[in-house]
Each structure stands twice: as structure tokens, then as C-alpha cells.
């Protein structure tokens, strides 16, 4: 495999393999680490995370017996929901050892007879035909230079009627920031640098046109783009409140420095979503 297409194991593990117990202190019981969908204002975080998963899966046209590939499967909530609700076979890919081990336990404890696999591997290493693809909160880690390769692979793996649901945070081009009258400050620039160096090493956000153009260039039609921007601000508010409420345990598990870093990250990102510097979108890509 060429060096440029080796999965970014080190970058992903630097964040996601910090400690499962630490993440449990602020995530909901499904351990879903992406934007929730508050379909109703009175939803709990767990209900809203399941609603987000259902929103994504509902766009795929899943039928019993199909095989769903989950690229960046996290701690397995989307995979297991797909098996439970749609009676499909699932394959999950993750670069995180902790996540892979957790999903293996979920699979071992499941009584459902459908095939359920999790691979400690990147999409760059996967080459099996599947019926549908879902990817929630992983695209941000790929790097702009790999978008074409990812869409090309997805197109090749899917059947003629294949669909991929891509859920990713998106950023604005500086020109768009100016056109929308948003302030370009050193504070904003410093925060972005903090995120890509101390929280998500190697992370880069796509713009909406970038996703649409790469999808189209590789044979997909983007049939729908749905923004969940206000939902991510609320999700982050709930995460930071939970982290703060468990401060003593956070510090005991990690350190005060890690606690402060995560509070800065969660509260700062919530503000970025509220102001409009960043967005989160679900792209429905039809082959």
C-alpha cells in the first residue's frame, strides 16, 4: 500500500484511545461521539443520539439481509442499531483499539444472528462489496487529499442502486466567512490551531462544495444535504455540562490539564457552531 494511503492510526488513537472510562463521563450510554438530533426539545441526549442514528440510517433504503459498511464505527451504536432496526449484516471499521475492543464485546453479547464484524482497519484497507455505506464523524479525519480515493472506493464497493450517507462537520472558506459578515479574529484562529494540534491531530474540515464536487466527480449524485448545526451546539453544551459535573472523576482518571483541555474544546466548539463558523451536515450520496 502506498504511504499516502496508509490509515492515520496514530492521529486517531491519540484522541479516541485516551480512556473509554473518561469518555463515558460525558457521553450518553450509547457512547455516541457525534452530533445528536433533538427531534423534540424534551429529548434526553441518549434519545437524541438514537434519533440521529435513525435519521442517517433512514436515508439509506436498507432492506433485511443487506450488508451495511460503517466507516468510522466508533463504539458501535450505529452498527447495532442497524442490526436491531433493519435486520442487516454489518461491518464496522475503526482505527481505535479501544473502540474495536468495545464493539467486539457488543457483538459477543448480541443474540441477533446477522453477521456483525468490526475491523481495526481504515477504509483504505477494505475491499469487499457492500450494499450501503454510512459514515458518521469520520470524514473529518481523512484529509482533503484522500477525498477522491474515498469516494472512488465507495462507488466501487456499492451496487448499481447503492447509497452512502456521509455525516461530517463542515467549515467555511475564508471568503464565505467574510460574505456572511462573521468576524475573523485571532481568537478564532488560535482556537482552530488548538483543535488540530491538541484535540484532533491531523483533522481537517471539508466545505460543503468540496464534498459535493468530490462525490460528483466519482459517480455519485448528492440528492440531499441536511444541516444539523443547532443540534451540535446543544450536544456540545450537554457534553461539557456532564464533564463539569464529573470533574473529580475526570481528573482522577486523567489529569486537571486534560480536563481543562476538554472543557476548552467542548465549550469553544459549541460557540463556533452557534456563531456559524462551522456546520454539520448529512450528505445523501446516490450511485
Curated annotation (Swiss-Prot):
Chief location of this protein within or outside the cell: cytoplasm
Binding positions for S-adenosyl-L-methionine per the UniProt entry: 33-34, 68-76, 94-99, 123-124
Recorded catalytic activity of this chain's protein: a 1-acyl-2-(9Z)-enoyl-sn-glycero-3-phospholipid + S-adenosyl-L-methionine = a 1-acyl-2-(9-cyclopronane)-acyl-sn-glycero-3-phospholipid + S-adenosyl-L-homocysteine + H(+)
Family: Belongs to the CFA/CMAS family.
This protein's record includes keyword Repeat: no
Keywords from the UniProt entry: Cytoplasm, Lipid biosynthesis, Lipid metabolism, Methyltransferase, S-adenosyl-L-methionine, Transferase
Disulfide bond entries: none
Full protein name: Cyclopropane mycolic acid synthase 1
Organism of origin: Mycobacterium tuberculosis (strain CDC 1551 / Oshkosh)
Pfam family, one: CMAS
Gene (name only): cmaA1
Gene Ontology terms for molecular function: cyclopropane-fatty-acyl-phospholipid synthase activity
Any Gene Ontology biological process: methylation
Amino acid at each position: 500500500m502506498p504511504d499516502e494511503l496508509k490509515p492515520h492510526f496514530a492521529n486517531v488513537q491519540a484522541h479516541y484511545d485516551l480512556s473509554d472510562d473518561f469518555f463515558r463521563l460525558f457521553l450518553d450510554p450509547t457512547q455516541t461521539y457525534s452530533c445528536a438530533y433533538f427531534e423534540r426539545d424534551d429529548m434526553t441526549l441518549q434519545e437524541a443520539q438514537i434519533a440521529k442514528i435513525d435519521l442517517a440510517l433512514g436515508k439509506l433504503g436498507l432492506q433485511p439481509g443487506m450488508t451495511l459498511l460503517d466507516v468510522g464505527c466508533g463504539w458501535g451504536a450505529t452498527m447495532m442499531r442497524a442490526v436491531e432496526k433493519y435486520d442487516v449484516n454489518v461491518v464496522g471499521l475503526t482505527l481505535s483499539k479501544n473502540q474495536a475492543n468495545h464493539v467486539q464485546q457488543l457483538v459477543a453479547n448480541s443474540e441477533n444472528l446477522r453477521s456483525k464484524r468490526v475491523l481495526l482497519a481504515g477504509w483504505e484497507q477494505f475491499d469487499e462489496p457492500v450494499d450501503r455505506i454510512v459514515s458518521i464523524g469520520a470524514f473529518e479525519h481523512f484529509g482533503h487529499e484522500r477525498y477522491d480515493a474515498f469516494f472512488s472506493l465507495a462507488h466501487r464497493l456499492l451496487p448499481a442502486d447503492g447509497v452512502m450517507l456521509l455525516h461530517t462537520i463542515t467549515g467555511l472558506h475564508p471568503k464565505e466567512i467574510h460574505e456572511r459578515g462573521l468576524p475573523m479574529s485571532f481568537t478564532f484562529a488560535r482556537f482552530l490551531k488548538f483543535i488540530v494540534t491538541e484535540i484532533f491531530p491531523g483533522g481537517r474540515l471539508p466545505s460543503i462544495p468540496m464534498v459535493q464536487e468530490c462525490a460528483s466527480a466519482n459517480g455519485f449524485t448528492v440528492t440531499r444535504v441536511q444541516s444539523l448545526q443547532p443540534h451540535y451546539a446543544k450536544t456540545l453544551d450537554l457534553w461539557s455540562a456532564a464533564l463539569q459535573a464529573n470533574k473529580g472523576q475526570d481528573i482522577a482518571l486523567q489529569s486537571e490539564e486534560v480536563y481543562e483541555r476538554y472543557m476548552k474544546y467542548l465549550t469553544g466548539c459549541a460557540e463556533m457552531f452557534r456563531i456559524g463558523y462551522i456546520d454539520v451536515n448529512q450528505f445523501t450520496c446516490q450511485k
